[in-house]
Design a protein with these regions (language model features):
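N-terminal glycine-rich anion-binding loops that anchor highly charged ligand groups
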Residues: 1, 10-73
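Well-ordered secondary-structure scaffolds
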Residues: 5, 10, 15-18, 28, ...
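Phosphate/diphosphate-binding glycine-rich loops and adjacent basic-rich segments that engage nucleotide
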Residues: 144-193
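Active-site cofactor/substrate anionic-group-binding motifs, chiefly glycine-
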Residues: 49-110, 114
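A glycine-rich helix N-cap at a beta->alpha junction
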Residues: 123-149, 219-225, 229
């Protein structure tokens, strides 16, 4: 088999076979196919596309390029959740303890943040003492014992995807939907769960800006998962404005704790309740969405979800006094309120640019080596469609460097718009696919 022939075949719009795809991924991962040939194939895929079989075989070849986690020692139906990422996306922090408190085992691997999107691991590690570095045995034992564990992704998980993604990043081949679907699903399938819930974001702060693209991506990922024998549900959700009120690691952890105490912002609560209900259906704990919703609300109101979060934090070395008393968390030195200069309504908040505000303050990574400041970020007081009077606080900026705070305030004002007429409130849940 020659890589030249595969490039030519795909350039002509012909489908690659299972054997060809497996050979290509194996040879590339082992360093026997050069980047220039793989780049040529990726560009041919961008122009000619992949059919369902090719997308599935590419996903499985990448999943099998490294360790495939075996979670069979964990009792029950293991349900994983993946978000395509956004700004203020602290979903896993509140969602996982809720479903774990209702008996669904959560054995989750999460990543760090890069660019304007924050990572679950960074947020958890802002809790003093919390460790995400676990051995496989300890990870499994913890899930069997308390129904929940979240650990950092290991380097052995889908190494072919890591190599391909780095190449796609520098060859303008990132945004091909089948390549995105196979990249995400290769890691999810390698992580060993029985069922997967996908939270596919759409809007200005999402990877998929257009809703039609988000739906197409969700459909392809659901198809791949089902072909691999997994139970699948995808929920298309809004990311035109930041999720909840807080953006920044410690600020988001505090908001997740508030939500588990029953005091979360409306949009975040709606998202959490919806995703948790679908996870309960996937895990076989409830018959339908309404029953799931009732049980999720009970878990929060009774304090079971918060207790489970504390149990989870303690099991991974975290200090639970910060959960009981979030005011103990370290706070930024500079706190600056941004006030409205006019009456009206909040017309739009560019989610991606608000993520950039957090990045300017030091709350994100410019490169993989960047060190994050967990104390910085912003907390909104007014969201889209809220009425505003002149002098009202729109948001509060948290920073540790006066120059960076000035830049962030300027950037905020350029991307937060007040209008005279009340706009329509954004719809959080756009569509559910399974």
């Amino acid at each position: 088999m020659r890589m030249y022939d595969l490039i030519l075949k795909k350039r002509q719009g012909k489908p690659l076979t299972k054997d060809e795809i497996q050979w290509m991924i194996r040879e590339y991962t082992d360093g026997r196919i050069p980047d220039y040939q793989m780049s040529a194939l990726l560009m041919a895929i961008c122009f000619q596309g992949l059919d369902k079989e090719e997308t599935y075989e590419l996903t499985m070849a990448m999943a099998r390029s490294g360790e495939m986690l075996d979670l069979s020692q964990i009792q029950g139906i293991k349900v994983d959740k993946h978000s395509t990422g956004g700004v203020g996306d602290k979903t896993s922090l509140a969602l996982t303890p809720i479903v774990a408190s209702l008996g669904i085992p959560v054995a989750k691997m999460s990543g760090r943040g890069l660019g304007h999107t924050g990572g679950t691991i960074d947020k958890l590690e802002s809790i003093p003492g919390f460790s995400t570095q676990l051995e496989d045995d300890a990870f499994e034992e913890q899930v069997n014992s308390i129904c929940i564990s979240i650990m950092g992704q290991t380097k052995d998980l889908a190494p072919a995807d890591k190599l391909l993604y780095a190449l796609r990043d520098v060859t303008a081949t990132v945004d091909q939907i089948s390549l995105i679907a196979s990249s995400i699903m290769s890691k999810k399938l390698a992580a060993g769960a029985d069922a997967i819930l996908l939270d596919v974001k759409t809007g200005s702060g999402a990877f998929m800006k257009e809703e039609s693209d988000a739906i197409q991506l969700a459909k392809e990922m659901v198809e791949i998962g089902k072909s691999a024998g997994r139970k699948m549900t995808a929920v298309i959700t809004n990311m035109d404005e930041p999720l909840g009120m807080a953006v920044g690691n410690i600020l988001e952890v505090k908001e997740a704790i508030d939500t588990l105490k029953g005091n979360g912002p409306d949009d975040f609560v709606e998202l959490i309740e919806t995703l948790a209900s679908h996870m309960l259906i996937l895990g076989g704990a409830v018959k339908d969405f309404d029953e799931g919703l009732m049980r999720v609300r009970e878990s929060i109101q009774s304090g079971k979800a918060l207790d489970k979060f504390k149990q989870f934090v303690a099991a991974q070395g975290g200090d639970t006094k910060y959960i009981d008393h979030p005011e103990l968390f370290e706070q930024a030195d500079i706190i600056e309120e941004i006030r409205s200069e006019q009456d009206g309504f909040v017309g739009s908040i560019d989610a991606q640019e608000m993520g950039i505000c957090s990045l300017i303050l030091g709350g994100g990574r410019e490169t993989k080596e960047s060190v994050i400041d967990p104390t910085v970020g912003l907390v909104f007081s007014k969201k889209v469609a809220d009425p505003v009077k002149k002098g009202d606080v729109l948001a509060t900026i948290y920073g540790n460097d006066e120059e960076k705070v000035k830049q962030a305030v300027l950037h905020f004002k350029e991307n937060y718009h007040i209008i005279e007429e009340k706009p329509t409130k954004p719809i959080m849940i756009r569509e559910v696919l399974s």
